[in-house]
Amino acid sequence: MNVTSHPVPEEAGELLTRIQRELNLSTKAMSNQLGITDVWMRRLLNNDIIPSQHLLKAIVTLYVRHPDPCILNHRRDLAHRFTQACARTYYARNHHRLQQRCHTLFHFPELTVSLI
């Protein structure tokens, strides 16, 4: 029996740290660029919170704006992985509430089960 190991999913905070390093910005400089406080930036980097849709867009835009053409694909890939990590984290933290909302909205428990 072949067992394939799945890589451990990357955390949004780790990917944001890589983005910050590649942009060569301090925590304070990056928080200023994004219009958030240093405390919020540290919480994002520590994976304590996930960014809102608007902040997520601002981070990705800041990261992929004006890249060197030879690293554009790398930056797009990392931005995509960061977005996926945020989505996984959001789902992991809110799956029960999402499940309840689906049940309430659709009144079909079998739909709720298929989402999990």
Identify the role of each PLM range.
Residues 1-24, 57, 101, 105-108, ...:
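A short, Lys/Arg-rich alpha-helix, primarily the initiator
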Residues 25, 36, 65-68:
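Short glycine/serine/threonine/alanine-rich loop segments
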Residues 29-31:
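Short alpha-helical "recognition helix" segments of helix-turn-helix
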Residues 34-51:
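Recognition helix of helix-turn-helix/homeodomain-like DNA-binding domains
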Residues 47-61:
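Short, basic-rich loop-to-helix N-cap that marks the start of a DNA-contacting helix
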Residues 60-77:
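Intrinsically disordered, low-complexity basic tails/linkers immediately adjacent to helix-turn-helix/homeobox/MYB/SANT
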Residues 72-109, 113:
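Short, charged recognition helix plus adjacent turn
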